[in-house]
Amino acid sequence: MAAKEVKFGDAGRKKMLAGVNVLADAVKATLGPKGRNVIIEKSFGAPLITKDGVSVAKEIELKDRFENMGAQLVKDVASRANDDAGDGTTTATVLAQAIVNEGLKAVAAGMNPMDLKRGIDKATIAIVAELKKLSKPCTDTKAIAQVGTISANSDHSIGDIIAEAMEKVTKDGVITVEEGSGLENELSVVEGMQFDRGYLSPYFINKPDTMVAELDSPLLLLVDKKISNIREMLPVLEAVAKAGRPLLIVAEDVEGEALATLVVNNMRGIVKVAAVKAPGFGDRRKAMLQDIAVLTGGTVISEEIGLSLETTTLEHLGNAKRVILNKENTTIIDGAGVKTDIDSRISQIRQQIGDTSSDYDKEKLQERLAKLSGGVAVIKVGAGSEVEMKEKKARVEDALHATRAAVEEGVVPGGGVALVRSLQAIEGLKGDNADQDVGIALLRRAVEAPLRQIVANSGDEPSVVVDKVKQGSGNFGYNAASGEYGDMIEMGILDPAKVTRSALQAASSIASLMITTEAMIADVADEKAAGGGMPDMGGMGGMGGMM
């Protein structure tokens, strides 16, 4: 086992604080509408230019192991805020730096670290409760666009396109961000339910110019097994032919004789038909087949519930206005499902999202929810170069997370004002002893840090602005982009309450742990590896007599 170096008390805390400050100083330069850029070297290709706090934090590794521990802990603050709300990483980093600096000063002055932590925790709980009171619902498109704009560093085009996407697919819809091919941002929306399985045979294509199979007013046969024997299907095919409607078959697979017969019938015009594999695998496939059944008002033909293909009738089939199949995807438009059944299925999936702890499962459930409730929107980010594309895409993703958070928990005045206004919640707050009171007081100073940093980045004097904002009330604050004071909500400067709350909770949680640190342990630096020299070979002098 490698030897370890241990640092105790102030010696360790000083090193840790140095690491905290290096990372936080690099990240906080990006905060606010006049935040500066950070350039990051890449091992290949052009350097990355970014104003995204979490991208900066991820790149920082320090040579000194003890300083690096401090930097990594603050990086964890940014990651926690990002995981919880998807944005607010820079605010969380600025808050953590302020709390750690103030806290370690108090520890050096002889305060009890555990009581300081309890004071910080009390004040955090009170401020979070006040932020919830300050928050206002965010439902209209204009407010959503404003939140997106602020999060994307005052880029109106990003805020507007996110608001438009949310309006089209509702708050439950899936919005994905991709790299575009032009200079302008583009939005495309997929109507209805789309899943990533295409036609099983190109002979189903009936629109050769666009290479798609399009079925108008089709019936849908949903089968939870492989179909290889055409005889099983004859009764249902005859019934569909009599009804004179097209048929879409969604099954685990359609192969051999069954597929060949369907193709021949389709080409001869006896039954207009197309077949596609069911999406997903295993239990997820069964769930997605059931989703399609609910959406189209059909029944999944499954032996588990005592249904077989031979006994299938038209009553078991789903209905839709139109189905479009291409090589990769199938889209079902305007399914004829009963609204109450669809709503019930949606609430069931929401419940599963709340119960699962797996990020992968959560993502897949969110996709299913979107397909049932709203649809899927794709934002294609346009830019003039690859470097700009990466930077812009990161900002669009941040803005998207921020707008989702705003819809979820409402909005508060932006620009660091909400945290300053929430100070009234801890005006009369008292701890159990003097050291806890110091913990409460240091958080009171620390929550001003984001406003101070925004002002500093815009080239103004932080103390003057903070005093003037404190003298005001309600939504009164400072617009760093224009240098004006006024109502932040009216000026369109909004922050999602969830982002501000998550940033404060993540910062005070990690900072409290750092304040209560008494010992730090790290591997001893390997001097030989650093020198890279060859070992001493002096003992080989007696080899001269060898032949």
Swiss-Prot record:
Biological process (GO), any one: protein refolding
EC numbers, comma separated: 5.6.1.7
Location (main, coarse): cytoplasm
Keywords: ATP-binding, Chaperone, Cytoplasm, Isomerase, Nucleotide-binding
Places the protein is found: Cytoplasm
One Gene Ontology term, aspect cellular component: cytoplasm
MF terms in GO: ATP binding; ATP-dependent protein folding chaperone; isomerase activity; unfolded protein binding
InterPro entries: Chaperonin_Cpn60_CS (IPR018370), Cpn60/GroEL (IPR001844), Cpn60/GroEL/TCP-1 (IPR002423), GroEL-like_apical_dom_sf (IPR027409), GROEL-like_equatorial_sf (IPR027413), TCP-1-like_intermed_sf (IPR027410)
Leading EC class: isomerase
Binding-site residues for ATP, renumbered to this chain: 30-33, 51, 87-91, 415, 479-481, 495
Catalytic activity line of the entry: ATP + H2O + a folded polypeptide = ADP + phosphate + an unfolded polypeptide
Pfam entry (one): Cpn60_TCP1
TM segment ranges: none
Cross-referenced HAMAP family: CH60
Similarity comment: family membership: Belongs to the chaperonin (HSP60) family.
Function description: Together with its co-chaperonin GroES, plays an essential role in assisting protein folding. The GroEL-GroES system forms a nano-cage that allows encapsulation of the non-native substrate proteins and provides a physical environment optimized to promote and accelerate protein folding.
The protein's assembly and partners: Forms a cylinder of 14 subunits composed of two heptameric rings stacked back-to-back. Interacts with the co-chaperonin GroES.
Protein name: Chaperonin GroEL
Annotated source species: Pseudomonas syringae pv. tomato (strain ATCC BAA-871 / DC3000)
Gene name, Swiss-Prot/TrEMBL: groEL
